[in-house]
Amino acid sequence: RLRAHDVFPAAWVPDLLMKRKEDPEAMWSFFSPHKFPELHELYGEEFEARYEELEALGEFEFQLPAIKVWRHILSNLFETGHPWITFKDESNRRNPQSHVGVIHHSNLCTEITLNTSKEETAVCNLGSINLAVVMSGDNPLEKLRTAVRLAIRNLDSVIDVNYYPSERAKLSNLRHRPIGLGVMGYYEWLVKQGVDFESDQHLEQADALFEAISYFAIEASADLAQELGSYPSFEGSKWSQGILPIDTAKKMEDGKPFFDRPRRFDWEALREKVKKGMRNSNIMAIAPTATISNIAGTTQCTEVPFLLQFYKTNLGGVYKVIDPSVRHVGTNYHLLKEAFYVDQLWIIKAAAVRQKWICQSQSTNLFAKQGTTGRDLDLIYTEAHRKGLKTTYYLRGQSATKDSASAKDDVIEALKSAVAQGATLSDAEAHQQAKLCSIFEPDCESCQ
């Protein structure tokens, strides 16, 4: 019984499988990658044409009903958390760098979607903006623009001073200069505004926010290109043609992107600027931020808290952590959510809204509480594909012996008690003191 403990499998799912699984009579053909390696290099209509040509010639090794293949993927996902479901065609169709290669897979956390080849190993430098801080107080949009522009410049600078473990990694990073700007504190930001995660108001806020981040990030990279020059493989890219991430967003039945709304910024003027040059081939990706968000004292990336109250162990010992969003709730207890008790379709909808504006992808976990069925999972992942997500991350299952509702109840009871006494949960209890990193501190939590 062999185990590959450091292998994290993902399913690189083409549109064709998602179509065929809807037909109980449709078959799925398995081909040898050694005989037909071109299938891994093709996507979209070209992939389907070659795939069906090989099927007609009988070149497959064996066949299974497409729905059986899909159910097998979902069963393994439910039992083990793997394989992560990622979508091959959507990732490649929206690839700004489709003129110089193909995306063969994501990174481990599924937010990075970059070309790879025998000559190049993809590298991406990541950073995350703390929305709970930046989007607070006066002039939040101006503060956001300042933060985004600074982050883009700094991430670009890392490319030139970085240590590269291989020449293939160095070649790739210097040729394409990809970066991945993301966020953390998203859920805390929503709670501070009094916005329910499971609401259309959330989608409206998310759309407006990520339009702004996308605009500011693209603008910053285009301005850097005028100052420092475009990345070497710019010519022929979607950027060079004035095609922006929002232009390639998947269209719904009405011919418009999901949750389409009037634009707030002058995208035509930006499009003309982008045609003249971009400093970076890719600029946005939402990483998990599991550790750095704890250090910053905010919620992880774009996620609903796994638990509102838990105990954490590190080099400093064991201590109780109460989710930082709790301190903003007041008496609006309905705003408090835990991931297992959120309708997962709201997670999909919110991710779809954000994905329109993002050139790479997002680390999007999904959560299966006790009683989740195969039909439920089919609906969730089919909807993720239909709404244009490029990737999903873990499917986290709930322990049969542990119900986190009690943790939420404990927090709410503490809040009610505090309110009754004319107070709120203290910052010391509701918010861990943010720690500043220092290269001179060998025990810094971010390095563990």
Residue ranges of predicted features:
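Glycine- and acidic
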Residues: 2-3, 52-59, 130-142, 164-174, ...
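Catalytic or ion-translocation cores adjacent to nucleophile or general acid/base/metal-coordination motifs
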Residues: 1-19, 203-209, 303-320
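Catalytic alpha/beta core of large soluble enzyme barrels
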Residues: 110-115, 155, 159-160, 259-264, ...
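Active-site cavity-forming subdomains of large catalytic enzyme subunits
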Residues: 1-128, 133-136, 140-141, 164-171, ...
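Conserved phosphate/anionic-ligand binding catalytic regions in large, soluble enzymes, centered on
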Residues: 1, 73-128, 175-191, 278-308, ...
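Internal maturation/activation junctions in enzymes
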Residues: 33-35, 147-170, 196-289, 363, ...
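Core structural elements
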Residues: 42-43, 152-158, 172-194
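Acidic, low-complexity intrinsically disordered tails
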Residues: 405-448
